[in-house]
Structures are given as C-alpha cells and as structure tokens.
Design a protein with these regions (language model features):
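A short, hydrophobic secondary-structure junction motif
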Residues: 53-55, 131, 280, 332
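Extended acidic/polar, glycine-enriched regions
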Residues: 48, 60-78, 131-191, 219
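Extended hydrophobic/Leu-rich segments
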Residues: 1, 83-84, 312, 316-317
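Short, solvent-exposed loop/linker segments at the N-terminal edge
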Residues: 47-53
C-alpha cells in the first residue's frame, strides 16, 4: 500500500544510526507506516494488573533495510517460582490497511457520501495480523501488539520476561516485560456485569475463508473468532430475520436466517433451521447466551423477502407500518416465531 499522506523521505531514513531499531511505544498511537516513529526509546515496559485481567502493550520496530522472515517470541514471565506461561501471552504484527476519512465534518457520523472524492484516503495501522512470520520492507515501521491475560490463579508479585524479534538477516532484538500482579481478582468475562454487544457477521467469515454457509467448515472457521468475542464479555447473539436489514451497506450483506414461505393457498410457513443452528452454536459451543438480538422489523429499505410457492421464486413485499400487508406479513410471523422461541426456551431472552 502506498500512503498519499506526507511521510519521511529516503534521506531521513538513511540517516538512522542503527539500521533496525526496536522500542516499546504506546497503545494510544497508530504509528505511520512510512515515517520513523516519534517514540522515546525504551526497552522496558512496566505495568500493573489484577489476577484475571488482560493488559496490552505496543512495541514498534523501524528499519532502513529489508528484514526477511521476521517473527516474534515471548518468554514465560517469572516471579520467583511463580510463572505466567507464554501461552497466556499473544503477539501480533499490526497490519496496515487503506481507509478514508470518517470525521471530515467533525460530526463523527457515518452515512452516504455522494462525492467520494471529497473524502481523503490514507494508510493506517489497524489489523492484528494472524500471520506470524513476515518480511518487513526497507524504510518502514512495523508495530507489534502484545496481550497478556494474567491467570486468575497467579500469585501476586512482579513477573519479568522478554519479547524477542528475530529475522533471517538481523540479530535478535529484545525488550523487557515487567508485570506487577496485584492481590485482586477480576471475575471471568461471563460473570461481568457490563453488557457488551458487538454485532457478529457470520456471512463475512464464510466469504473470507471460502467455505459454504452453515457448513461444518463454516462453523470451524467461526469458532476461534467467536470465542475471542466471548472472552471479551459479549452478551448478545446477532441474528438477521430478514434479507439485508441494513440495506446491505456492509461488505458482506446479511441474509435472512429464517425462510418465510407463502404457500399456494396464501397461508404462511417458516423454516427456522439456520436460525436455530446459529443460535445453538453461539450458546452451546461459544457460551454467549444472555440475549438473542433479531434485526429487524423496520429496515432501512421497507422491502421484505419471502419464498412464493405460486411462482417458485423469492419475492419482495414493499410495504410499511400501518399497511394491511405489513400487519399480515409481520403479525403472522411474530405469532409463529413466539411459539418457536417458547419451544426452544429462548422467548424471554429474545428482542427485536
């Protein structure tokens, strides 16, 4: 990606005293890709944490020469005979993506942009990459994100360890880690009082991993992603009960998880197979079971899908609240949906 924003020239990069440098930075800054980071060099990161708490840090590497097969390792953190294992620590290269302005008018809103040329684009550090070994180009900056999940069973004390970056053509570079674990315990995420609801899009997972919707491969791909969400304290399951509830403005639009069938005699039937499969997966395998959020009876576009047996095709009903057709479409569905939810034991935790 080429950044259109001003950045350091080759001459500035070439003045670096050491070809490759590594330091702790701050989690408050997205470091530009093509400029030398503005950091006060430090090889020691110190923080305090409760038992059961997760703490984050960001290191930043910058280099005027290309690095081959760069990778990150962390040691166990030790306090006397007590250990926070390296398995409780995750590290990721931070990947850069192209984005555009959101807050040009300082109103902080989103929406349609009639003239997209008026909104500037830039390269920003955003994605915590799943790639563990990568080449780093000359005259670039590479942030590194570290997360430590202190075990609830950890003993209080000061734990020390190291983060190391290595590469084929570079000597190992080390940073020191020091976590002061206090004698207080944070409850497990499932026991938090805070209500977190980050919408899930299973359709995007299927597209990204190129697997059939609702197949075993699809659920296998979603499992680690949704478990991360559960570990963040997620409370609600996102379900789409109609086609494109948000008019399809996301990269991967939401289909309806419930099939509506208008029979030849004009009566309605409903297939909840996908809805049930998704909800049961999230509840039973992931552990998110406080609430089922259903979207929506009032979509951006007042157009409602159903399969029509008379024409053997999917049709769309254009209607609005107050119309008889709207009352028939939704009233009949809500009665049957309520029956189904009660049979599953989900009625009291479902909201539209």
């Amino acid at each position: 990606l080429t950044d259109t924003k001003p950045h350091d020239s080759d001459e500035i990069w070439d003045k670096l005293s050491a070809p490759t440098q590594l330091s702790w930075g701050t989690t408050d800054i997205r470091y530009p890709k093509l400029s030398i980071p503005d950091v006060k060099k430090s090889n020691r990161w110190q923080t305090k944490a409760w038992k059961g708490e997760r703490v984050n840090a960001q290191a930043v590497l910058w280099t005027k020469v290309g690095l081959e097969d760069a990778s990150i390792t962390v040691s166990d953190l030790k306090s006397g005979s007590s250990i926070i294992p390296s398995s409780a620590i995750t590290t990721n290269f931070v990947r850069y993506v192209m984005t555009d302005e959101l807050n040009k008018d300082r109103k902080g809103g989103c929406g349609h942009r009639e003239n997209k040329a008026e909104w500037d684009s830039s390269v920003v550090a955003d994605v915590l990459d799943i790639v563990k070994i990568r080449d780093i180009k000359a005259r670039t900056t590479q942030p590194i994100w570290m997360n430590i999940w202190v075990p609830q069973s950890a003993k209080a004390g000061k734990y020390k360890g190291t983060l190391t970056v290595t590469g084929k053509n570079a000597s190992p570079m080390e940073l020191q880690i020091e976590v002061d674990v206090l004698n207080r315990t944070l409850p497990a995420p499932k026991d938090w009082a805070f209500h977190l609801d980050l919408w899930q899009n299973p359709y995007s997972v299927a597209r990204y991993y190129q697997v059939p919707l609702w197949s075993k491969e699809h659920f296998d791909a979603m499992r680690p992603i949704m478990k991360m969400l559960a570990n963040a304290g997620q409370r609600a399951i996102t379900t789409s009960i109609m086609h494109k509830p948000w008019a399809g403005q996301t990269e991967d639009h939401f289909d309806s998880m419930i099939t509506r069938i208008k029979k030849i005699d004009g009566t309605w039937a409903y297939d909840y197979a996908v809805f049930d499969k998704w909800v049961e997966f999230m509840m039973n395998e992931i552990g998110i079971d406080d609430m089922i959020s259903c979207y929506t009876m009032i979509p951006w576009a007042l157009s409602f899908d159903y399969y029509d047996e008379a024409t053997n095709r999917v049709q769309f009903l254009n209607t609005k609240p107050g119309d008889a057709a709207y009352a028939d479409y939704w009233g009949t569905f809500l009665k049957d949906f309520s029956r189904h939810l009660r049979e599953k034991g989900w009625f009291e935790k479902t909201a539209i």
